Amino acid sequence: MSNDQSFKNRKPDMGKADPGTIKRIFSYIFQYKWRVVAIVVCILIGAAAQAGSALFLQSLIDTYILPMVGESNPDWAPLLRAITLMGCLYVAGIVASWAWQWLIVTVEQGTLKKIRDDMFAHQQKLPIRYFDSHEHGDIMSHYTNDTDTLRQAISQSFPQMFSSIISAVAALLSMLWLSIPFTAFVIVFTVLLYFIVRKIVSRSGRYFVKQQQWIGDVNAFVEESVNGQKVIKVFNHEDATQKTFDEKNEELFEASAEANTWGNVTMPVVGNMGYLLYILLAIVGAAVSLAGVNDIGLTGVKPLTLGTLVSLLTLSRSFINPIGQVSQQLTMVMMALAGASRIFKLMDEPIEEDKGTVTLVNVELGEDGRTMTEVDHETGHWAWKREVGDDGTRSLKAAEKLKGSAREVAMKAKEQAITSPDGRLTLLRGDVRFTNVTFGYNPDKPVLHDITWFAKPGQKIALVGATGAGKTTVTNLINRFYDIQHGQILYDGISVAGIKKPDLRRSLGIVLQDVNLFTGTVMDNIRYGRLNATDEECIEAARLVNVDSFIRMLPKGYNTVLEGDGSGLSQGQRQLISIARAAVADPPALILDEATSSIDTRTEEVVQAGMDNLMKGRTVFVIAHRLSTVRNSDVIMVLDHGNIIERGSHDELIAQKGEYYQLYTGAVELE
């Protein structure tokens, strides 16, 4: 777990939402274009019904109600017909509103599903470097908080803003129809309101962006604290961790409080300004009507009637209220844009590059051990296949350009490789060679310095050294989790840079110190090593590494469901299942990254025999945690600050009484 100080000093990015975010959101939404069209039509019908109802008030009062006042025997039929028509308008508006809210559900959920699918698909293509440099809790926040804010915007904010704008435009046109002077007065008043609301929204928008960033940061800290709870308790870091969390939570509180304070002010301000406009219009309208001043509308010049005044007052509310609703929804949109920007930032991260062209294929091997025929079924023999036109000449020329011992190592690899007559097939034997390799996670700070070494097919190579010596880095480079800055890594005489990454990794079985099990049965977790493996092959792999007896003691044996990364199993049991997973993959080469470091001594004795069976005939790289596990290695390499300072067998290195001797006798601590 990262220390508290590094967490304390780390600040999330506080940039503004990307201006292209809205365009990208709508590119997803318009995948449902016909539903969107239907939603727009329903919103237009609703706005027209609302404006029509307000206009109808004028006719209802002036044409039907006022003429009946004072009559001894009024005719109610026309009034009832008018009220029925008005009711139909209201019903049309209600049905249209219900329809678009029903339609938006599919658009909303479908859009989010597509975004999550694309985000996860892109995430699967990201290099390991990305996950090593980003908190997992922050990545998870993209799928939870960020998508939830986007959901609210798609289902509520965007359609309601559009509906409000259409309603405001309809109300404006209706007011112009009735009275141009009164409409001008409303517009001037609205411009004043616009500047007030703009100031409020701009303040809230900045804080909503900060809020989303801090939510991701807090989530990342909580996840790391939960994963490291044992470490926190062992070192009595509860108070320090609590203090760091409180500081981050305080930042989130301040950003959220500011964002929501300014966001919640919008509607009260607009509402009260709307009441003020209503009162002013009523006073001015009454004065104009009593003075007998004619009014000017799109229909001509005529006196300001009671019906016209009531319609204008109603329309003014229908004009101001949508503006308030737009202002309020803008705060939600700002939050959604902040979340969407984070989502699209993840989706814009550069994917893992793979310029390799060499693939891994099944072959049938002739009796001479050199003749190869490519087949489409598993044979137990593999070969590297170059693309058409590549007979290996290019890699040979690259090897010839190397100097000194590196050139000698590379040329021997080429000579010893078993290749077909046309040069396109090279038998996979597990011959791995580093030539003048220099690498740093930060190019300016190399972790490995001009490393040259080789592993012959079937050899067991142990990498030992203190923490930070570069042991794990070597294995990261073999499977191309990272690419080297200088030098060359050869696999059966072929540069790993020229091999397609999926094929390269298929040839390597990896057992890590940190075990990851997935929700599912024990059988499913073993089969994860090779998805097309049968149940019998999975059981055979478990027997090979002496895991079968332990699994059969579980409640449902191989069908026991594991949850929460194998909670309920001991660390050693989880490690055993991961070793069986590597066994079922049946890889030509193995990387054991401190594979038995989490297993107690007694359990280690049980699994070691199985591990020996698994390693037979394979090139194996072992990152040593316990030196007792590497005594029978063919070659032991001692690394120190990125340099190979010693190499040889156990007995040879003990006799030298150098660094390995110091590690073995306990004079220097091994990690």
Predicted feature residues:
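Juxtamembrane helix-loop junctions of ABC transporter transmembrane domains
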Residues: 11-18, 41-42, 49-62, 89-136, ...
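Helix-loop-helix
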Residues: 174-188, 262-341, 346-347, 370-415
